[in-house]
């Protein structure tokens, strides 16, 4: 059930009919310190992204290594529905590496802020413009779809950024990216930024946001509110430093809050999240939105009673919609209805005396910070029944 205020706000927005998700788990996600996917793992993740319905998959950075090229090439040859892209610096050699992988397109980038020009590239603005023109034209001449990203664009003076984007457009780029490389934007600023870009180029705009201030998803959605038509994501929000905009959060927010749904098979999200967590070695926080272990778990007696009556009272998303399950957790906040529901699951008649005694023991364990698992509950119920002279095993009913 959507908030009436969200409905009212969205009605007043000039939203795009469709938003393209170009997922970079296999490239930017793999740049998470300590993460390295095998080619087989990359292929499996790519298949799950494709099953989800992601329109574009950024499969890697081919110039990095021969192993990376092999992995990108395998994904490109897999016959997926998604367009397969890869990253390329504004260098012909990087484009050649992409061509060698048979990808559909490239995301080519160069830094544009004075900070990067002075301390990293040691290049003039004119040299940057020349590199953009040469690389975009070269990639287009060789039949590639091309997106251009101005690295650290959100810290670049717009006077120069306008020239950057116009150069990319004039040389044939298919899309330009508003890139918040170090996550310094706020939603209001991102809306302003995208609006300014729309004034100077007649191309679709994508957005690539990092999460250094925890704003990647909010900034990505703000960009869509301002007319951006593509969002860069990673599964579980993994990526350099604090990570990127989380795929699962972006997709569900677009669908449930903005009414933008190109037909994603969202039931795949939980499996995809678990697989990326397993292969990356990065645990999903239990309170992670959409796919965290606690996202659909309830302990408070008041909440459990309401959820059992009408799930929407405390669940803005149906857990099955994202491949998750609702879980009633027992602890010191547990109420009678949760115990009744659990007893019924075990096939035990929820008589008043049994419910009260089980509830008392659960709360006592909760006060001692003992987690009441399903097996622990069965033990409690068994002891309560035995104390009443009933020897049946509740777990076998």
UniProtKB/Swiss-Prot annotation:
Pathway: Organic acid metabolism; 2-oxosuberate biosynthesis. Residues 19-270 form the Pyruvate carboxyltransferase domain. PROSITE patterns: AIPM_HOMOCIT_SYNTH_1, AIPM_HOMOCIT_SYNTH_2, PYR_CT. GO terms for biological process: biosynthetic process; carboxylic acid metabolic process. It catalyses: acetyl-CoA + 2-oxoglutarate + H2O = (2R)-homocitrate + CoA + H(+); 2-oxoadipate + acetyl-CoA + H2O = (R)-dihomocitrate + CoA + H(+); 2-oxoheptanedioate + acetyl-CoA + H2O = (R)-trihomocitrate + CoA + H(+). It holds the Pfam family HCS_D2. Its EC number is 2.3.3.14, 2.3.3.-. It comes from the Archaea. Gene3D superfamilies: 1.10.238.260, Aldolase class I. GO terms for molecular function: homocitrate synthase activity. Keywords: Transferase. Catalyzes the condensation of alpha-ketoglutarate and acetyl-CoA to form (R)-homocitrate. Can also catalyze the condensation of alpha-ketoadipate with acetyl-CoA to form (R)-homo(2)citrate, and the condensation of alpha-ketopimelate with acetyl-CoA to form (R)-homo(3)citrate. These reactions are part of the biosynthesis pathway of coenzyme B and biotin. Belongs to the alpha-IPM synthase/homocitrate synthase family. This is Homocitrate synthase AksA. It comes from Methanopyrus kandleri (strain AV19 / DSM 6324 / JCM 9639 / NBRC 100938).
């Amino acid at each position: 059930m959507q908030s009436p205020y969200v409905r009212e706000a969205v009605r007043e927005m000039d939203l795009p009919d469709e938003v393209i998700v170009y997922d970079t788990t296999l490239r930017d996600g793999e740049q998470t310190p300590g993460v390295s996917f095998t080619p087989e793992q990359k292929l499996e993740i790519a298949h799950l992204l494709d099953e989800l319905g992601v329109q574009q998959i950024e499969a890697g950075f081919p110039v990095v290594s021969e192993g990376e090229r092999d992995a990108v090439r395998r994904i490109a040859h897999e016959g997926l529905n998604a367009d397969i892209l890869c990253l390329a610096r504004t260098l012909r050699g990087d484009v050649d590496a992409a061509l060698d992988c048979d990808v559909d397109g490239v995301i080519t980038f160069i830094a544009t802020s004075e900070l990067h020009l002075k301390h990293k590239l040691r290049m003039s603005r004119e040299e940057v413009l020349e590199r953009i023109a040469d690389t975009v034209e070269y990639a287009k001449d060789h039949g590639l779809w091309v997106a251009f990203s101005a690295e650290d664009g959100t810290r670049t003076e717009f006077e120069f950024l306008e020239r950057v984007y116009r150069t990319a457009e004039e040389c044939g780029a298919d899309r330009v990216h508003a890139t918040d490389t170090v996550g310094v934007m706020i939603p209001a600023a991102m809306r302003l930024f995208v609006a300014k870009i729309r004034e100077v180029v007649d191309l679709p705009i994508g957005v690539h946001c990092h999460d250094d201030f925890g704003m990647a998803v909010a900034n990505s959605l703000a960009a869509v509110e301002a007319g951006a038509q593509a969002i860069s994501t990673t599964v579980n929000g993994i990526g350099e430093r604090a990570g990127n905009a989380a795929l699962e959060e972006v997709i569900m927010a677009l669908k449930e809050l903005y009414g933008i749904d190109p037909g994603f098979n969202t039931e795949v999200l939980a499996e995809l999240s678990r697989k990326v967590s397993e292969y990356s070695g990065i645990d999903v926080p239990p309170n992670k939105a959409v796919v965290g272990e606690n996202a659909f778990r309830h302990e408070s007696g008041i909440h459990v009673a309401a959820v059992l009556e009408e799930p929407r009272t405390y669940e803005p998303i149906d857990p099955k919609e994202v491949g998750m399950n609702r879980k009633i957790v027992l602890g010191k906040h547990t109420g009678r209805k949760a115990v009744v529901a659990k007893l019924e699951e075990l096939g035990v008649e929820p008589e008043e005396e049994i419910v009260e005694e089980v509830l008392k023991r659960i709360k006592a364990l909760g006060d001692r910070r003992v987690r009441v698992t399903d097996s622990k509950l069965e033990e409690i119920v068994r002891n309560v029944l035995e104390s009443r002279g009933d020897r049946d095993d509740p777990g076998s009913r």
